[in-house]
A protein has these predicted regions:
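C-terminal or internal capping secondary-structure element at the end of a domain, subdomain, or sheet
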Residues: 448, 452-473
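Short, surface-exposed beta-strand/strand-loop-strand elements in extracellular ectodomains
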Residues: 156-161, 279
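Exposed beta-sheet edge/beta-hairpin loop segments within beta-rich domains
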Residues: 251-252, 443-450
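Short beta-strands and strand-coil junctions in structured, solvent-facing domains, enriched
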Residues: 333-334, 464
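Membrane-interface helical sensory segment of bacterial ECF anti-sigma factor regulators
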Residues: 1-4, 16-66
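Short alpha-helix boundary/capping elements
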Residues: 14-18, 145-150, 199-203, 269
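Flexible propeptides and autoinhibitory/regulatory segments associated with cysteine proteases
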Residues: 56-157, 296, 437, 442-443, ...
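Non-catalytic, conformational "gating/processing" segments within enzyme and secreted inhibitor domains
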Residues: 60-80, 86, 128, 135-138, ...
Length: 473
C-alpha cells in the first residue's frame, strides 16, 4: 500500500465508526452504488479517403481475430503453494519487483499525462449544463492510435501523452490499465479496448500483436458498415459498459471505413461509509439556470479536507479501492475558474497534497445522474493533435503501408450517477483503523455543502477515470 492510499484510509474515520466501537454493537448499513454504475466509451472512426484498396467480396459478422488477455494479477504468493522456503522467497521477491515496476511506470505516466488531463478537462467540461468525460478512456484510445500511426501523426499524439516513443508508451499503458482495473464482485473498475478491422484488407501483424499484448486490445474483423458488424460492435460496447449507455449507441459505420477503435470504462462500487436514506432531504441547489429543488444526502465523517487557491475538496473511499473527489469552488468562483487553473488535477494526482487537514466534515451532497455524448475532435486539435484529422496529412502506415485513411470522428459517451441502493453492506471499522489510532484531539468540524455547481473526479490509484461538472443535479 503506497503512502497516499494509507493516508487516505487512516484519515477517513466516521463518527459512526467511533460510536460503533464504543457501543460494541454490530450494525448493518445501506450502501451507495457510485454510478449504479459509471461508464464511458470513446469511439474512434477512421474512414477511407481513396478507394484503391481491395473491397471484400463476402460478408461475415465480425469474426474474432484476437482476444485481449486478462490483466496481470500481481497477487502476493502464498507460502503453502511452494515446496521450499527458497522457492517462496524467490516468488515473494519477484512479486515485490513487479509491483514496484508497475508503480514506477504508472507514476511516470501520470507525470506526463497531468497536462493532458487538466487541459482536456478544461476544454471538454464547458457550458452551463452538466458536463462529463473520461480522461482514462480517451487516453487508452489515443495510446492505441499512436501505436497504429507514423511520422508527425504519431509524434503529435505522443507529445500530448507525455512520452517520446511507443516502447515507453507500451509500458505505461500496461501499468495504467492494470492499476485502474479491479474486479471484486459487485465492486468493479474495468477497462476494455477493441479494434475492428475491415475484412479483405491486410494489416501489420506486429502492430496487432502489440495492441493485444501491451494495450489489452481485442481485435475483430468484419464488413464495416454492415448490419451484422454494426450489431456486433453495439453488443460489445453495451457488454463492456454494463448497458448503461444504451441510449447513446455507437455511430453507424459506413462501408468506406478502414477500421474503428472503441475504448470503454465500466465502474461500480459502494461507499466505505454509508449515506442513510432516512437522512435525505429536499432543498435548493443554486444552478446557473436558476434555483431548483433537489434531493440531498447527508453524512458526517472524520476525513481529509484539501484546499486549493480557489476551492475546497474532500474525497470518499470506495470498496473497490477507488476514491470519489468532490471539489467545491469558493464563493464568487465558478467551476470553469477551477478547471482553467488545473490545480485540482494536481491535487488528485498528488501522492501527498500539502494544504490538507483532518476535519469532521458534515457532508451535504446532491444525488445526481450525469450523462453526455460529445465530440473530442475540436479539443484534441486545440491540444496539438491535428494531422490525424487531415486526409492529406494523416499517416497510419504503421498499420498498413500507404494506408489512405484519416480520423473521421472521435466521440465519447459517458455517464456517472450516485444514489442509495439500499443494500446492506459489510463492516468497515477494522479496515479504517488498521495500523493506527484516532487523533487525541477532536478536529474542528466543517460544513461541506454542495448546493452550487461543483466538480467531481472518480479516481483509481490516482488515475482519473471520470471527471465532471454538476450544474444541475
Amino acid at each position: 500500500m503506497d503512502r497516499n492510499t494509507l493516508n487516505k484510509a487512516l484519515t477517513y474515520i466516521s463518527d459512526q465508526h467511533i460510536s460503533a466501537a464504543a457501543k460494541r454493537k454490530r450494525r448493518h448499513s445501506h450502501w451507495i452504488t457510485v454510478t449504479a454504475a459509471a461508464t464511458a466509451a470513446a469511439i474512434l472512426l477512421l474512414v477511407m479517403v481513396q478507394t484503391t484498396l481491395p473491397k471484400p467480396t463476402f460478408s461475415v459478422a465480425a469474426n474474432t481475430a484476437r482476444i485481449a488477455p486478462s490483466p496481470r494479477n500481481i497477487a502476493f504468493p502464498l507460502q503453502a503453494d511452494y515446496e521450499t522456503e527458497d522457492a517462496f522467497q524467490y516468488a515473494r521477491e519477484n512479486h515485490l519487483s513487479l509491483q514496484a515496476e508497475r508503480r514506477l511506470q504508472k507514476e511516470y505516466a501520470l507525470n506526463g499525462l497531468a497536462a493532458f488531463f487538466a487541459e482536456g478537462s478544461a476544454l471538454f467540461l464547458t457550458g452551463e449544463e452538466n458536463a462529463l468525460w473520461s480522461p482514462v478512456s480517451a487516453y487508452m484510445s489515443l495510446a492505441s492510435l499512436a501505436e497504429l500511426s507514423s511520422g508527425r501523426s504519431q509524434r503529435q499524439i505522443l507529445k500530448l501523452l507525455g512520452v517520446n516513443n511507443t516502447n515507453t508508451l507500451r509500458k505505461q499503458v500496461s501499468s495504467i490499465f492494470e492499476s485502474a482495473y479491479a474486479d471484486k464482485g459487485k465492486d468493479v473498475s474495468k477497462l476494455a479496448t477493441s479494434l475492428w478491422l475491415q475484412e479483405g484488407i491486410s494489416y501489420q501483424d506486429d502492430k496487432i500483436d502489440a495492441l493485444v499484448k501491451d494495450y489489452y486490445t481485442s481485435v475483430y474483423s468484419g464488413i464495416l458498415g454492415s448490419t451484422e458488424t454494426q450489431q456486433a460492435i453495439t453488443d460489445w460496447v453495451n457488454t463492456n459498459t454494463g448497458d448503461l449507455l444504451s441510449d447513446y449507441p455507437p455511430d453507424q459505420l459506413t462501408t468506406d471505413a478502414v477500421f474503428a477503435l472503441y475504448s470503454t470504462v465500466y465502474f461500480q462500487s459502494q461507499w466505505k461509509d454509508d449515506f442513510d436514506a432516512k437522512f435525505n432531504f429536499s432543498d435548493i441547489f443554486h444552478s446557473p439556470a436558476g434555483d431548483r429543488d433537489v434531493t440531498y444526502m447527508r453524512n458526517s465523517a472524520r476525513m481529509t479536507y484539501c484546499r486549493g487557491d480557489n476551492f475546497g475538496a474532500v474525497y470518499l473511499p470506495l470498496e473497490n479501492g477507488s476514491y470519489m473527489w468532490f471539489i467545491l469552488p469558493d464563493e464568487n468562483t465558478t467551476a470553469q475558474d477551477v478547471l482553467r487553473s488545473g490545480q485540482y488535477m494536481d491535487m488528485v494526482l498528488s501522492q501527498n497534497w500539502e494544504d490538507q487537514q483532518t476535519v469532521i466534515a458534515h457532508l451535504t451532497i446532491p444525488k445526481f445522474d450525469v450523462a453526455e455524448k460529445k465530440s473530442l475532435k475540436d479539443g484534441l486539435m486545440q491540444l496539438g493533435v491535428t494531422d490525424i484529422f487531415s486526409a492529406d496529412k494523416a499517416n497510419f502506415s504503421a498499420l498498413r503501408s500507404e494506408l489512405p485513411a484519416f480520423a473521421g470522428s472521435i466521440q465519447q459517451a459517458s455517464r456517472v450517477q450516485i444514489d442509495e441502493a439500499g443494500v446492506t453492506g459489510a463492516s468497515y471499522t477494522e479496515i479504517i483503523y488498521m495500523g493506527s489510532t484516532p487523533p487525541s484531539d477532536t478536529p474542528e468540524p466543517i460544513d461541506f455543502i454542495l448546493d452550487r455547481p461543483f466538480l467531481f473526479v472518480v479516481e483509481k490509484d490516482n488515475i482519473p477515470l471520470f471527471t465532471g461538472v454538476v450544474n444541475e443535479p
